[in-house]
Amino acid sequence: MASVTSIVKAADFILSRPTLSRVVVPVSKLFCAYAGYREMGLKFNDIIAEENPIMTKAISRLPEDLSYARNYRIITAHQLALSHQLLPPSKAVKPEEDTHYLIPYILEAEKEAFEKQELDNIEV
């Protein structure tokens, strides 16, 4: 599995190349539009798997208001999935509202985990 750090570096590389950016950005926007998570009230960072120590640490570092909002969105999405419904377009998450609120915390937790691994494996 790729780390979020490597994904961010790849995204920065793509965005720094105008030709790649003209091809990849519209495709990624189309993918996000058809993925359907926004129609269930979720943001992209809400669908990242949280069953690993780095994600658990990143989620625990979220400010209280972001954490409550995230939990509310996930519970709402579960309820919509159980009832086989989607949010009306007025309540669905808009593309400009779909911010990467969790990525800085994940990058920080990955950096700390990498540093800890390096220090644990140091040879004197």
Can you describe what each PLM-predicted range is?
Residues M1-I7:
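Hydrophobic membrane-targeting and insertion signals
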Residues V8-V124:
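Core mature regions of organelle-targeted
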